[in-house]
Amino acid sequence: MKCLHLAATALGLAALAGCVAPVGPVEVTRFHVPELSSLGRGAIAVEPAAGQDGQSLEYRSYAAAIARQLVLLGYSEAPAGTASPQFASLRIERRSFRADRPRSPVSVGVGGSTGSYGSGVGLGIGLDLSGPPPEQVETVLGVTIKHRASGKALWEGKASFAVRAASPLAQTQLGAAKLAEALFGGFPGASGETIQVK
């Protein structure tokens, strides 16, 4: 009976794993000033970068994910309507695309052989019937932490990943959390280094 229960559990986990879409790593690049003492302390506000719609649901989801990470780093969230000493300028870019096929959908092969009883030539044709590549969604998240009074950039980071359009992570809520965690993991990070976060 115990074996049957374990087998059923294993089958359930396998089925669940099949429902989770594969996700590539998040590419993260960060830059910061040499003096880091002002980072990770005091009040901070998340604000839309120029050209961003700060009232959209997408922006608010990403802003909330960024704010959570900043609080975990030691910042406090500035009350609405107050001018915090630092602010995080947030930019979001999303685009849909289809990857180019690396090869032709039709392939032709020719083979020949010679033996004691004669020779022969064979011709083979292969057709790729898998259809076009699935649509992908790329999301790029950019955050710049600035000193409000001087406008000086103290820290800047960019995180990006691409997933299938049908993946749950193509949706804003899940994608925002994943990108924000990757962007601020190991904060402030090595300046100028690009890393892959799985």
Residue spans of the language-model regions?
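Solvent-exposed loop/turn segments at secondary-structure junctions
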Residues: 51-52, 94-97, 161-162
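Envelope-exposed proteins and targeting segments
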Residues: 40-42, 66, 73, 84-88, ...
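Acidic helix-start/capping segments at beta-turn-to-alpha-helix junctions
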Residues: 78-99, 198
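C-terminal/domain-edge helix-coil "capping" segments
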Residues: 19-36, 130-198
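A structural "domain/chain start" motif
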Residues: 19-73, 100, 192-198
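Structured segments of extracytoplasmic/periplasmic soluble domains
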Residues: 65-76, 95, 182-190
